[in-house]
């Protein structure tokens, strides 16, 4: 009986005791916010000092009691802001609520703007992406491995706060914006690092879901306090924060528009004139580019935000997430990186989505990863390491899978040359030979670019070879789908082969340039000229600048490899029309050019579906396949909620539709492409604006799209 009573008492204590784990956010040189969650008692006390045995200052804070549909526990959210601290100083602290106290932890305030943290002039950051999954120990394993790696790199007796200033999480900190997920997915899975390193967050699409949605995000984080040069975004969706000589710009890919872009321009104007800022890093949840689930990116980030950021010579890179893998690429003409740090969320491997190999992506690896960014403040250098713990199919022990860098004030590579001698006309195939890569600072070759044109000024490119020394894309062999293949293994990228019959006969010009692994381009080589003869079959191309146009907006068609007849022409017709039987909507002759553009300045006045064709010698022989496009208003689709019960009714509102014959709305699973995958649900649209309801969807992630018949 005594044993039974003892066991029962012990179980009750375990059930009702409160283990306290602090969560740090919003670091500055003079302050730190400390948060934690309990299930009872509104006492909020932090006790801190300059040594673990001398905690002699007490700070009290506030407690908010949150409630949420379906959350049956108490949720006391404690917040204490410690102020009047010294810059770049290590403090020891513990937190207290009632009779419960945490262990003693430590944090470090940020250095003054422009200054390093360490004695050897460094400041470092951790970057991590999506966690989301509650039921599996994925993200907690990732943070534990990051904790271990910091110990391994900087010494077993060191604390994370000694060598890293903060962690940036790039969105989808939760799967849905509920109290349950903030408690058990975000806070609980971060306890390896959150007592030592402040965590700054970016809004992801999953923060907008669930019973509380963004209100839960706003309640847990204090982004409205963050300013740069006294500039606030005026909301908690996006912000700029300086740490040392780095300015982080956390964008919201979920709240795009002119207001955010205007704010971004204000931030850049200040940063460009701020001598304490040497580097700018931007972040958004939806990425700049992606080679899986192609198109699932932020077009606003790609087309608006990043082009604006690249106008600053302080801009280093853009970091995205959303895709649950690691990817790294470079902007084609500018010395800027773009990353996906996709954490450990729902499985994403080769063969489960639409995939495409893009020039501006050097590697896509389906690993669960984190990155350590090391900034050498004194010498103007940034080095980034990416560590992997593997994934579902293969585990890895903090394996280093990528490194890259950017160093200021370094020389560009030596100017290359085309070493071929063209003393007579040539027949294809032709291998263009570039000179050996050379750099005065021992940088290695990363990228080469060969351009071939029939125009001496390269105004129209007939053929381009743009290659990195490595190109990790697609499944490798017949093994597990996490294995990625290096498509450029064994390829000498200083050589480029023009295949037989791939370009037409005629005179061509060629030039090349080389890029090193510091993202510096060489000067272009001297141009060489050659003549192709005996090419029987050309490889003409024909593209439009867009697939959707508003009424009366310009339409540009670009063609290469044409026959070169004086009256070759580009024409536009309505969908379903035969060119020989009707008058075109408009046409333009090529005037004997084999390559060029046809600009329809005033576009088309009437909404509808059309196609453009490339025709030979004033007749109706089509040189290339037709290009279909749409003219009309931009349709707006809006779901009434972000989440729905399984089998329930999904309501889609639409407006500004063209209301053509048999327009329809389809429901597809994320990653599926209309026309190549079976849709889940669909229905016709009969008005320009209205509502459609879809019922019976199984569990999963979906999107709605407006399609034309």
Which ranges hold each PLM region?
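Active-site-proximal beta-strand elements of phosphoester/diester hydrolases
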Residues: 120-135, 245-255, 281-285, 336-343
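Extracellular recognition modules
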Residues: 92-96, 509-515, 611-615, 703-708
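Extended active-site neighborhood of metal-dependent phosphoesterases/phosphodiesterases
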Residues: 90-112, 181-274, 304-317, 325-364, ...
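Active-site-proximal segments of metal-dependent phosphoesterases and phosphodiesterases across multiple
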Residues: 139, 255, 274-317
């Amino acid at each position: 009986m005594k044993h039974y009573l003892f066991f029962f008492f012990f179980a009750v204590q375990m059930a009702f005791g409160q283990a306290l784990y602090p969560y740090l956010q919003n670091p500055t040189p003079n302050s730190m916010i400390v948060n934690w969650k309990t299930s009872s008692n509104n006492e909020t006390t932090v006790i801190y000092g300059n040594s673990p045995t001398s905690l002699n200052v007490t700070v009290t804070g506030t407690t908010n009691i949150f409630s949420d549909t379906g959350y049956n526990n108490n949720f006391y959210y404690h917040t204490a802001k410690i102020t009047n601290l010294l810059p770049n100083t290590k403090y020891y602290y513990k937190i207290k609520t009632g009779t419960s106290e945490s262990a003693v932890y430590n944090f470090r305030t940020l250095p003054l703007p422009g200054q390093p943290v360490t004695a050897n002039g460094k400041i470092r950051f951790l970057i991590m992406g999506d966690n989301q999954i509650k039921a599996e120990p994925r993200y907690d394993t990732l943070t534990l491995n990051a904790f271990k790696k910091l110990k391994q790199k900087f010494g077993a007796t060191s604390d994370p706060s000694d060598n890293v200033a903060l962690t940036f999480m790039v969105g989808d900190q939760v799967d849905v914006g509920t109290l349950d997920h903030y408690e058990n997915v975000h806070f609980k899975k971060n306890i390896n690092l959150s007592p030592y390193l402040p965590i700054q967050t970016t809004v992801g699409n999953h923060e907008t879901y669930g019973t509380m949605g963004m209100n839960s995000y706003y309640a847990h984080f204090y982004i409205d306090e963050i300013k740069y040069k006294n500039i606030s975004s005026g909301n908690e969706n996006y912000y700029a924060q300086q740490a040392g000589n780095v300015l982080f710009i956390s964008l919201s890919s979920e709240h795009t528009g002119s207001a955010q872009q205007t704010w971004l321009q204000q931030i850049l104007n200040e940063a460009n004139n701020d001598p304490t800022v040497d580097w700018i890093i931007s972040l958004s949840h939806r990425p700049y580019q992606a080679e899986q689930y192609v198109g699932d990116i932020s077009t606003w980030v790609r087309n608006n935000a990043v082009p604006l950021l690249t106008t600053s010579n302080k801009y280093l890179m853009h970091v995205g997430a959303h895709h649950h893998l690691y990817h790294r690429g470079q902007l084609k003409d500018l010395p800027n990186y773009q990353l996906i740090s996709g954490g450990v969320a729902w499985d994403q491997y080769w063969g489960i989505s639409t995939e495409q190999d893009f020039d501006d992506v050097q590697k896509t690896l389906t690993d669960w990863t984190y990155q350590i960014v090391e900034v050498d403040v004194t010498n103007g250098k940034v080095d980034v390491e990416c560590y992997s713990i593997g994934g579902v199919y293969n585990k890895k022990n903090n394996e280093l899978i990528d490194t890259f860098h950017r160093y200021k004030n370094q020389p560009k590579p030596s100017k290359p040359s085309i070493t071929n001698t063209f003393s007579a006309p040539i027949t294809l195939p032709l291998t263009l030979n570039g000179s050996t890569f050379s750099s005065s600072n021992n940088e290695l070759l990363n990228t080469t670019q060969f351009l071939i044109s029939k125009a001496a000024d390269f105004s129209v490119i007939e053929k381009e070879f743009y290659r990195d020394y490595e190109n990790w894309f697609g499944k490798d062999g017949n093994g597990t789908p996490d294995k990625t293949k290096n498509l450029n293994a064994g390829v000498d990228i200083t050589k480029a082969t023009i295949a037989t019959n791939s370009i037409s006969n005629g005179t061509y010009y060629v030039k090349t340039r080389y890029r090193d692994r510091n993202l510096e381009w060489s000067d272009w080589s001297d141009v060489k000229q050659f003549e192709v003869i005996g090419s029987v079959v050309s490889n003409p191309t024909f593209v439009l600048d867009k697939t959707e146009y508003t009424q009366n907006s310009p339409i540009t068609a670009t063609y290469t490899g044409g026959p070169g007849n004086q009256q070759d022409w580009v024409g536009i017709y309505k969908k379903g029309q035969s060119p020989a039987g009707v008058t075109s909507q408009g046409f333009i002759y090529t005037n004997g050019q084999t390559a060029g553009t046809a600009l329809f300045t005033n576009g088309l006045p009437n909404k509808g579906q059309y196609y453009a064709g490339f025709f030979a010698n004033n007749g109706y022989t089509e040189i290339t396949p037709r290009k279909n496009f749409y003219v009309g208003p931009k349709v707006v689709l809006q779901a009434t909620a972000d989440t729905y019960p399984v089998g329930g009714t999904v309501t889609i509102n639409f407006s500004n539709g063209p209301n053509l014959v048999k327009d329809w709305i389809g429901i597809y699973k994320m990653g599926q492409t209309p026309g190549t995958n079976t849709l889940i649900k669909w229905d016709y649209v009969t008005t320009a604006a209205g509502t459609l309801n879809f019922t019976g969807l199984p569990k999963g992630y979906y999107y709605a799209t407006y399609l034309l018949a």
